[in-house]
Regions:
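Ubiquitin system architectures
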Residues: 1-76
């Protein structure tokens, strides 16, 4: 499963599952408006590149394309 992540700060991330780039950009812009500080610290990466992240209170089987997920970093 591919998740595109947007980093809000060092602990909270929003992930969007398996989206075409144009739709992802649209949702990304909405998150930018909600979190102005994102503009300067935007960090996009995939699940495989950041294995320290996991889903917060979500069952992977229930995630649909386009869902926006709140993420957090696991303690090492």
């Amino acid at each position: 499963m591919v998740i595109n992540f947007i980093s809000i700060d060092s602990t909270v991330h929003y992930g969007i599952k398996c989206l075409p780039t144009d739709i992802f950009a649209e949702i990304e812009e909405k998150l930018y408006k909600k979190y102005d500080n994102l503009r300067n610290t935007n960090n996009l990466f995939t699940c495989s590149e950041k294995p320290v992240l996991r889903f917060k209170k979500l069952c992977e089987n229930n995630i649909k394309d386009g869902d926006i997920l709140q993420m957090y970093k696991m303690n090492k």
